[in-house]
């Protein structure tokens, strides 16, 4: 019998399958460790233009170390497939436990709800939202502790990230604002799903469950449900505050953590200390396989990518076509750029030196540089992507984007970073003149 291998992993039986992906049991041949390997069709991601979103979320999830979240170890790729290596959880789905045994006791339901909120809150703090929380995505380890699966992978097609797929798939756990086909806040929508899950754990059945979709949607939209009489008053009160159809007034996770019913027997999870994680495998997996082959052939360096007129229009701050499709308030804050007349290798090496002097690690590949490290408060990961483009024979443009971390911290980084690159950043003559006049005035004062 021929044993199939992917990298150092020996593949076994299929343990899960969806429309666009399958999950196989696999074993690390170097350590003997069992893992779950999610196999995704590369062309599906490219066709649906989801590369950047999935790359970002997988990058962040590789950095996540939380006892209540299934760990993502690494990402491998072939020409046609992307292989996501995940922690293998042996205890099965929480959903199966409910089907087998019926509703849980109040204390057991509360324990799982504690772990659910801890895991969800931690991932939200990293900027990743699940968007498809349900008991089937909650696994149990060998000790019976809850592990949230597919966090950060919800952007993959089979996970139902689109409103259409979610609506047609498992709408029973979905927030009213998601079903309304309007924009929604991922964190607030996840909280609603947590409330439905808590109800199911304690009741053994769904709060919203109708045979026809119009009636189901109507009940979800109005939050028409009732709690069984055996629910404790504290549990009823909390569930009612979570299943608030108005996302603006719905309880937040911070408020859930202060709730009297929630606090009973609550022991915060012990977080795993930050450790440096290399993201090269993630970026390589999502690169164009043709580019990878080209690079491996040892072909001579042809310099930075040259932008054409249309590329420049799209990247221009004065006419950013991307804003037509993304009207988020932070869309312009996360992306910045500058012009330089220096040679590309000088620009790249200068940026590397400055980044390292600011205490960050750098990774360079094909005129792209990733800068990463801890945030200013040392509690989360911070990462920036820089790419050098050729605009004209002696003009380069450096595009800088926030990859992980909040907008305010990114803007502080950008300001400090550019102030240290004065010798390579080109400024228009009138801007240079204004700077000299301003400095002269300040000296006279």
Swiss-Prot record:
* InterPro entries in UniProt: Kinase-like_dom_sf (IPR011009), NAF/FISL_domain (IPR018451), NAF_dom (IPR004041), Prot_kinase_dom (IPR000719), Protein_kinase_ATP_BS (IPR017441), Ser/Thr_kinase_AS (IPR008271)
Q: Which residues carry this modification: Phosphothreonine?
A: 166
Gene Ontology molecular function terms on file: ATP binding; protein kinase activity; protein serine kinase activity; protein serine/threonine kinase activity
Active site per database record: 132
Carrying Phosphoserine, the residues are 154
User: What are the BP-aspect GO terms?
Assistant: protein autophosphorylation; protein phosphorylation; response to glucose; response to nitrate; root development; signal transduction
Name the family the entry cites.
Belongs to the protein kinase superfamily. CAMK Ser/Thr protein kinase family. SNF1 subfamily.
Provide the protein name: CBL-interacting serine/threonine-protein kinase 8
Source organism of the structure: Arabidopsis thaliana (Mouse-ear cress)
Q: What is the lineage of its organism?
A: Eukaryota, Viridiplantae, Streptophyta, Embryophyta, Tracheophyta
- Which gene underlies this protein? CIPK8
């Amino acid at each position: 019998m021929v044993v199939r291998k992917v990298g150092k992993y020996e593949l076994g039986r299929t343990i899960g399958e969806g429309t666009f992906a399958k999950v196989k049991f696999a074993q690390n041949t170097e350590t003997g460790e069992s893992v779950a390997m999610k196999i995704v069709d590369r062309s599906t991601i490219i066709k649906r233009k989801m590369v950047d979103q999935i790359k970002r979320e997988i990058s962040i999830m590789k950095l996540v170390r939380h006892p209540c979240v299934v760990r993502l170890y690494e990402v491998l790729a072939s020409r046609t497939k992307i292989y996501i290596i995940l922690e293998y959880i042996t205890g099965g789905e929480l959903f199966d436990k409910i089907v087998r045994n019926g509703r849980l006791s109040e204390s057991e339901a509360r324990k799982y709800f504690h772990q659910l909120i801890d895991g969800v809150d931690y991932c939200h703090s990293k900027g990743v939202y699940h968007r498809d929380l349900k008991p089937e995505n909650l696994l149990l380890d060998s000790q019976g502790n809850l592990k949230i699966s597919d966090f950060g992978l919800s952007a993959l097609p089979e996970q139902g990230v689109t409103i259409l797929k979610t609506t047609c798939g498992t709408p029973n756990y979905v927030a009213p604002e998601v079903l309304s086909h309007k924009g929604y806040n991922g964190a607030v929508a996840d909280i609603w799903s947590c409330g439905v899950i808590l109800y199911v754990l304690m009741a053994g059945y769904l709060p919203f469950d109708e045979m026809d979709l119009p009636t189901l949607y109507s009940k979800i939209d109005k939050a028409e449900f009732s709690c069984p009489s055996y629910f404790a008053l504290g549990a009823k009160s909390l569930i009612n505050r979570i299943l608030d159809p108005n996302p603006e007034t719905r309880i937040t996770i911070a408020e859930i953590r202060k709730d009297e019913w929630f606090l009973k027997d609550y022991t915060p999870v012990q977080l795993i200390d930050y450790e440096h994680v290399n993201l090269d495998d993630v970026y390589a997996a999502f690169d164009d396989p043709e580019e990878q082959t080209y690079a491996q052939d040892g072909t001579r360096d042809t310099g930075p990518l040259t932008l054409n007129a249309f590329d420049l229009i799209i990247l221009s701050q004065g006419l950013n076509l991307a804003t037509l499709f993304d009207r988020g308030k932070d869309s312009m804050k996360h992306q910045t750029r500058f012009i330089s007349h220096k040679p590309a290798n000088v620009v790249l090496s200068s940026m590397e030196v400055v980044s390292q002097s600011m205490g960050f690690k750098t990774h360079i590949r094909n005129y792209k540089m990733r800068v990463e490290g801890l945030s200013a408060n040392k509690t989360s990961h911070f990462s920036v992507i820089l790419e050098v483009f050729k605009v004209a024979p002696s003009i380069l443009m450096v595009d800088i984007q926030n990859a992980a971390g909040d907008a305010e911290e990114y803007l502080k980084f950008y300001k400090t970073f550019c102030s240290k690159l004065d010798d390579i950043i080109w400024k228009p003559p009138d801007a240079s003149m204004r700077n000299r006049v301003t400095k002269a005035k300040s000296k006279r004062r």
